[in-house]
Amino acid sequence: MQHKLLINGELVSGEGEKQPVYNPATGDVLLEIAEASAEQVNAAVRAADAAFAEWGQTTPKARAECLLKLADVIEENGQVFAELESRNCGKPLHSAFNDEIPAIVDVFRFFAGAARCLNGLAAGEYLEGHTSMIRRDPLGVVASIAPWNYPLMMAAWKLAPALAAGNCVVLKPSEITPLTALKLAELAKDIFPAGVINVLFGRGKTVGDPLTGHPKVRMVSLTGSIATGEHIISHTAPSIKRTHMELGGKAPVIVFDDADIEAVVEGVRTFGYYNAGQDCTAACRIYAQKGIYDTLVEKLGAAVATLKSGSPDDESTELGPLSSLAHLERVSKAVEEAKATGHIKVITGGEKRKGNGYYYAPTLLAGALQDDAIVQKEVFGPVVSVTLFDNEEQVVNWANDSQYGLASSVWTKDVGRAHRVSARLQYGCTWVNTHFMLVSEMPHGGQKLSGYGKDMSLYGLEDYTVVRHVMVKH
């Protein structure tokens, strides 16, 4: 397994403290990797800053060609990446290979094309004798912090737009799941000029802080928790860096009486528990109208009970383990607190799986109330709650009564209601009669404490640029 850092076009061993990397399906240590030292963090940023002098002036075509080459090598090594992601994250191998790798390849290919479509406003004379033009230029060095739930996917979401816009990047994957990012570094070093992409390994305190606080870093992009986002925003405030934050979610799933219940059950069974529920957009907070509530709880409970947890190598496995022992304990604690309320009923699941690995049973909780912690706080595991509501006004207010604002869905056959409710929901994305669908052409990002800035789409590309005005006297 590739375990070296990429700094200035060279693969080098870390000079800091060694950290274990686990296989969450067994609890075994896969290997130990040395963190980047403070000197190596500085070297990576300095290399990126030096490379920016030329990379920032390359043509969109040249950048697109590099991104397309990277997409090709990821596709060619898809099985290798899927196996690494499966071993390090516990994802079912078939899901990593069939679902994630094609989407990752598409992200790089999309931004290769988008790089050639980005432009400013046409020139014009807004002052007599002067011509103005608007430029969209790269910022410089971008520090990208990727999470542990989709390590390679999130690396792609961050690298592709930043590079397409002409920036240079220092990427720090989560210390829990670094293996695919390190493999990506190995393949990228022969495609991009030295220093354009740098990949480090280490914890937030030892590597993340010196990276995001470095005076040569002009932008920090984070996908992570609210707490981490708060820390980085305050940590970078003295140097007035641009920040791009995707900080989690608690997606409301609004099911009206007229919804297609079979579609709802199938959708939540899939999209509430995909990746063991470790997804910011997971369909985890159901609001069911009183006329459909009982039937939905019964049918969904039966469907969730059929979800198969097991070895990531088994083709029939639908749910792998959680990412770490610490996270398993957090999920378990959240469910135990829900049980302790007395009014929340466990329909299925509600316990850790026996045996090796960090497995938690797919869980459905009914009878949750709006103010319950299980409704208000992100669990980030295979846990879905169901809350009864009376009418449209009530459920819209409840759905918006959340610190999160990333994703939501509305299930109804009434087209007017679908438009009306979608317009009022305070979420970056609202799906109607589906959930979880993402495409490279459409923006992904939140409101409120879910953060700001967009991933994917041309809006995502624009986030990695600075708008500049050039005026020429004639």
Curated annotation (Swiss-Prot):
Biological process annotations from GO: L-lysine catabolic process; putrescine catabolic process
EC number: 1.2.1.19, 1.2.1.-
Keyword entries, A-Z: NAD, Oxidoreductase
MF-aspect GO terms: aminobutyraldehyde dehydrogenase (NAD+) activity; NAD binding
InterPro entries: Ald_DH/histidinol_DH, Ald_DH_C, Ald_DH_CS_GLU, Ald_DH_N, Aldehyde_DH_dom, Aminobutyraldehyde_DH, PatD
Residues that bind NAD(+): A146, P147, W148, K172, P173, S174, E175, D209, S225, I226, A227, T228, C280
Domain of life: Bacteria
Keyword Glycosyltransferase: no
A Pfam family annotated for this UniProt entry: Aldedh
EC class name: oxidoreductase
Pathway: Amine and polyamine degradation; putrescine degradation; 4-aminobutanoate from 4-aminobutanal: step 1/1; Amino-acid degradation
Miscellaneous comment as given in the Swiss-Prot or TrEMBL entry: 4-aminobutanal can spontaneously cyclize to 1-pyrroline, and 5-aminopentanal to 1-piperideine.
Stated role: Catalyzes the oxidation 4-aminobutanal (gamma-aminobutyraldehyde) to 4-aminobutanoate (gamma-aminobutyrate or GABA). This is the second step in one of two pathways for putrescine degradation, where putrescine is converted into 4-aminobutanoate via 4-aminobutanal. Also functions as a 5-aminopentanal dehydrogenase in a a L-lysine degradation pathway to succinate that proceeds via cadaverine, glutarate and L-2-hydroxyglutarate.
Family stated for the protein in its record: Belongs to the aldehyde dehydrogenase family. Gamma-aminobutyraldehyde dehydrogenase subfamily.
The protein's name in its UniProt record: Gamma-aminobutyraldehyde dehydrogenase
Organism of origin: Escherichia coli O1:K1 / APEC
